[in-house]
Amino acid sequence: MKTVCVGMSGGVDSSVSALLLKEQDYRVVGIYMKNWSRDLPGMKCPWAEDLADAKRVAVKLGIDFEVWDFEEEYRQKVVEYMLAEFKKGNTPNPDVMCNQEIKFKLFYERAMERGADFIATGHYARAVSLARAFATTGANARPLGRELPKANEASPITMGASKEASESDIVLARAKDENKDQTYFSIGFLMKRWRAQFFPLAT
């Protein structure tokens, strides 16, 4: 059985992602990424409540659940970056940096070290195989997005593209729900990681 580590924040999107993957016969492991726990002046960090929500969902779904502490890495890669950009008079985008350095880098690396086959998040985006991206012609031509395959299929890429295919065969594409599309916040990490990434909410 293929194993998927799902980043679970305690919110609806990541919870539904875990449910969809379980329904497709994957061994799902819920992962709460503890990135920040400090209260700021006038602002309480709700990490404990988020963690409790994620745990409750994992229990309800009957899946394993773990907490991975990325606080130090988050401080170095995201917070310090943000403060440095402000000092330069620039407008930083900590969400993009968090995805690039934490959710799609450290999370991916830790999951692979743990022995997972894939990772998944609740982002609204698609990983598209260019090998079959344009399956139709003429007025009906449109890219095909990744769908959730059964757990015994060899690759997470729709229409049979293999893991051994060229990294350039995989590109990031907008989610079908363009009102919720998050591809802008998901840019910036190595294409090879798309091969092990599920976006269950893509469609």
Locations of the language-model features?
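Conserved catalytic cysteine-centered active-site region
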Residues: 192
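ATP-dependent adenylation/nucleotidyltransferase module used to activate substrates
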Residues: 1-133, 137, 143, 149-188, ...
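Short, glycine-/aromatic-enriched active-site segment of Class I SAM-dependent methyltransferases
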Residues: 195
